Amino acid sequence: MNLFPERNPKLAWREIDGEAVIISPEDSHVHELNETASLIWTSADGRHSVDDIAGVMAAKYNVPLPVAKADACELIETLSAKGLLLSKQREVQAGA
């Protein structure tokens, strides 16, 4: 099983200078994400797993994969707790 984070479709967002700015229409709250959180946000399309996202982070920031995965999990948990991300679990097909 692996998590496949997905952006909450109820939110409006734009990327400005490489950083995501997210607006919650329910309460007009604005969330400004840093570069790393923005990478996770833009990758969270429901098709890329946490492992996929961690791999991109490891390559981009030149850190070991376990470090990138720990950071990705922490940020995904934080964004999910704020209602910005939704996460789906599914079985990963061999060779997929």
Protein language model features and the residues they cover:
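Long, low-complexity, charged/polar intrinsically disordered regions in eukaryotic proteins
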Residues: 1-25
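Long, charge-rich, low-complexity alpha-helical segments
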Residues: 26-96
